[in-house]
Curated annotation (Swiss-Prot):
Chain residues that bind ATP: 55-63, 80, 148, 150, 200-201, 212
Residue ranges of domain Protein kinase in the record: 49-258
PANTHER family: SERINE/THREONINE-PROTEIN KINASE RIO1
Record keywords: ATP-binding, Hydrolase, Kinase, Magnesium, Metal-binding, Nucleotide-binding, Phosphoprotein, Serine/threonine-protein kinase, Transferase
Modified residues (Phosphoserine): S108
Protein name: RIO-type serine/threonine-protein kinase Rio1
Name of the encoding gene: rio1
Length: 258
C-alpha cells in the first residue's frame, strides 16, 4: 500500500499529457516508485516538461514519448526506462564484463542496470560524435535514459522489419549502403561494434538510425570481432530478401577499412 501511495504521489507531480487517465494507468502498471522518483527529478531539473504515450514495452525496458528541453530548446524525447527488477540482464553480462570502461567488481543486480543505462548513453554519445546516425543522447539518471525521439507526431519511425513490403517501394540498395556506411563509421571512427545489429533495431525515416546501443562494445572487447561478423551477416541476410547481393568477406573488409 505504501508503494502504491508513492506511485500515486509521483504520478501527481509528473505532467502526463493524456487527460483520460489511460496513460496514467499504464505508468502505474509498468513503473515502480523509485523510477517515478527519478523521472520526477529529471522533470525538476528541467529536462522533461510533459510525459506522453508509450512507444514500446519489453522485458528489459519501456520507452515513452516526452516533451522536453535540451540546451535551452524544446525537443521531442524518447524516455527509455530499464526495468530494475529483471532477469534479462544476466544475458547482458558478456557485453559488460568484457568492457574496460566499467569496473564490474562487486556489482549488485540493481547497480548493473544503472551501469547498463550509462553504457548506452556513452555509446550513443561516442557514436554521435563520430557521425554515426543514432538518436542524440541528452542525459541519464540511474535507470532512465533521455534521447532524441525519432519519428513524427509522437509516432516512432518504423524499423526495417516493420517496413516489411513497403521497403520494396523504396531505394533498397541505397538503404543498404546507408547501413553499411554507418557500420563502417561506427567501427572506424567511434571504435565500437553494435553487437546486436539487425532489422529490428535499425529505424528508417529518410535515412537509417541505429538504436538499442546498450550492448555495443569497444574494439578491445574480447568478442568484438565475433560480434562484428554477426552484425555483418545479419545485414546481408536481411537485405538479400530484397534482392541486394553482398559478399560477406568483402563487406567485412570494407567495414574495417582493410
Amino acid at each position: 500500500m505504501k508503494d502504491l501511495k508513492k506511485i500515486e504521489s509521483y504520478l501527481d507531480k509528473l505532467r502526463i499529457k493524456e487527460k483520460d487517465g489511460e496513460e496514467r494507468k499504464i505508468y502505474a502498471e509498468v513503473l515502480d516508485g523509485r523510477t517515478l522518483k527519478t523521472l520526477y527529478k529529471l522533470s525538476a531539473k528541467g529536462y522533461i516538461t510533459a510525459m506522453g504515450g508509450v512507444i514500446s514495452t519489453g522485458k528489459e525496458a519501456n520507452v515513452f514519448y516526452a516533451d522536453g528541453v535540451f540546451d535551452g530548446k524544446p525537443v521531442a524525447m524518447a524516455v527509455k526506462i530499464y526495468r530494475i527488477e529483471t532477469s534479462e540482464f544476466d544475458k547482458m553480462d558478456e557485453y559488460l564484463y568484457g568492457d574496460e570502461r566499467f569496473d564490474m567488481r562487486r556489482i549488485s543486480p540493481k547497480e548493473k542496470v544503472f551501469i547498463w543505462t550509462e553504457k548506452e548513453f556513452r555509446n550513443l554519445e561516442r557514436a554521435k560524435e563520430a557521425g554515426v546516425s543514432v538518436p542524440q543522447p541528452y542525459t541519464y539518471m540511474k535507470n532512465v535514459l533521455l534521447m532524441e525521439f525519432i519519428g513524427e507526431d509522437e509516432l516512432p519511425a518504423p524499423t526495417l522489419v516493420e517496413l516489411g513490403r513497403e521497403l520494396k517501394e523504396l531505394d533498397v540498395e541505397g538503404i543498404f549502403n546507408d547501413v553499411v556506411e554507418n557500420v563502417k563509421r561506427l567501427y572506424q571512427e567511434a571504435e565500437l561494434v553494435h553487437a546486436d545489429l539487425s532489422e529490428y533495431n535499425i529505424m528508417y525515416i529518410d535515412k537509417v538510425y541505429f538504436i538499442d546501443m546498450g550492448q555495443a562494445v569497444t574494439l578491445r572487447h574480447p568478442m568484438a570481432e565475433s560480434y562484428l561478423e554477426r552484425d555483418v551477416r545479419n545485414i546481408i541476410r536481411f537485405f538479400s530478401k530484397y534482392g541486394v547481393k553482398a559478399d560477406f568477406e568483402e563487406m567485412l573488409k570494407e567495414v574495417k577499412g582493410e
